[in-house]
């Protein structure tokens, strides 16, 4: 078999060099593309598909177009509420516009407690009883504790006067004990 000299001629089986690239428009209209042309075309399409992301250096010169797009869109008036919702609640008892919160309403609710019930609550108050026990033991109380004890005792005296309950002193109890005739109980 005779040897054949290598040629630099482009054939269908040879890969295309960058310098040999032909524009795709030169393909024959109406005729079927050759295998070589189909391969070149598919390679170009693959490059286009493979390319993702931003161009080189676009990080520094990129302009946010997303903000302008959002502003240009028309909002549907049926969607969402027009009333603005505060993210941080600053004033809990702040009235709405046009509404009025009477200042005496809170005081009236506090005063509606039954005096007898309030008296029993004060008498059964554990912290007050503990502070009174400490006073009886001869300990000195702090200013806050002394003020608390004085306020509670004043309120108890006020409620007892309001209900008509009189506190019997120890001297009265001794007198009644001494004056009792024991023969009555036999």
Swiss-Prot record:
Q: Does the keyword Nucleotidyltransferase apply?
A: no
Feature: compositional bias, Basic and acidic residues: 9-25, 34-45
Q: Which domain of life is it from?
A: Bacteria
Q: Which residues form a coiled coil?
A: none
What Pfam families does this protein map onto? YihI (PF04220)
Region (Disordered) residue spans: 1-65
Question: Subunit arrangement?
Answer: Interacts with Der.
The role this protein plays is:
A GTPase-activating protein (GAP) that modifies Der/EngA GTPase function. May play a role in ribosome biogenesis.
Matching HAMAP family: GAP_YihI
Q: Know the name of this protein?
A: Der GTPase-activating protein YihI
Q: Which organism is it from?
A: Histophilus somni (strain 129Pt)
Record lineage: Bacteria, Pseudomonadati, Pseudomonadota, Gammaproteobacteria, Pasteurellales
Q: Tell me the name of the encoding gene.
A: yihI
